[in-house]
Swiss-Prot record:
Name of encoding gene: ssuB
Keywords noted in UniProt: ATP-binding, Cell membrane, Membrane, Nucleotide-binding, Translocase, Transport
Record flagged with keyword Disulfide bond: no
Subunit structure: The complex is composed of two ATP-binding proteins (SsuB), two transmembrane proteins (SsuC) and a solute-binding protein (SsuA).
Superkingdom of the organism of origin: Bacteria
Record protein name field: Aliphatic sulfonates import ATP-binding protein SsuB
SMART domains to which the protein is assigned, alphabetical: AAA
Domain ABC transporter: 11-230
Chain positions recorded as ATP binding sites: 43-50
Family according to the record: Belongs to the ABC transporter superfamily. Aliphatic sulfonates importer (TC 3.A.1.17.2) family.
Length: 243
């Protein structure tokens, strides 16, 4: 879906294993997330999707295997997690993890990012006045302010209504193309995975059991092959659709 400007890896994982007590929740995971591409990770609840994301984000340290990340990754969750006592602008600058940038420069960068995510007049707004879609866009701006090469998304559109979800998905793709980001998208939504991802990985009981490269030109959702890609993923998930 994305126009790949570079095949530089944003993240490379080899032989990743992780256990909680005696239960091994990740069983030798291998994956590469390239800059300019979206990789979707699907699977049933408890399959290990969020655990992989937490490892890549540096939030889970005790594991074996090799994990190489280009720069500092950024994370956005299903819940925007905005601080209600800070303005929208200050919420975005809160995501800056660099000390070599002045406060005024940070504010300028945050304001520019809000314009980029289609919220140009919201600097002084308060989080509680925002719609769900607007809050999610602020969360995206906050994730981008440190100029990451790897963006980790954990069900980012799950709480949005259908129309707002489509708008947010299109914004994500434009952002990936403009910034040449590598993205790992954790989702339960098979249609979303096909609409957004260059590669889809199925995780089952801590292991990647299937992988799919999505090659659909133009508007994916209206393309005849969209249904066949979706059916393939549903078959892997052992989900039957009504006749």
């Amino acid at each position: 879906m994305t126009a790949t400007l570079s095949l530089k890896p944003a993240a490379t994982v080899r032989g990743l294993r992780k256990s909680y007590g005696t239960k091994e929740v990740l069983q030798g995971i291998d994956l590469t997330i390239n800059c300019g591409e979206v990789t979707a990770l699907i699977g049933r609840s408890g399959s290990g999707k969020s655990t992989i994301l937490r490892v890549l984000a540096g939030l889970s340290k005790e594991h074996s295997g090799s994990v190489e990340i280009s720069g500092n990754p950024a994370v956005a969750f299903q819940e925007p997690r905005l601080l209600p006592w800070k303005t929208v602008l200050d919420n975005v600058t809160f995501g800056l993890n660099r000390t070599d940038i002045s406060w005024s420069e940070a504010q300028e960068r945050a304001s520019a990012l809000l314009a980029e995510v289609k919220l140009p007049d919201s600097d002084a707004a308060w989080p509680l006045t925002l719609s769900g879609g607007q809050a999610q866009r602020v969360s995206l701006a906050r994730a981008l302010i440190s100029e990451p090469e790897l963006l980790l998304l954990d069900e980012p559109f799950g709480a949005l209504d259908a129309l707002t979800r489509l708008t947010a998905q299109d914004l994500l793709l434009k952002t990936v193309n403009t910034r040449n980001l590598g993205v790992l998208l954790v989702t339960h939504d098979v249609s979303e995975a096909i609409a957004l991802a260059d590669h889809v990985l199925l995780l089952d009981d801590g292991a990647i059991t299937h992988s799919l490269t999505v090659d659909i030109p133009g508007d994916r959702r209206t393309h005849p092959s969209f249904a066949s890609y979706t059916a393939q993923l549903l078959e892997w998930l052992e989900i039957t659709t009504p006749a």
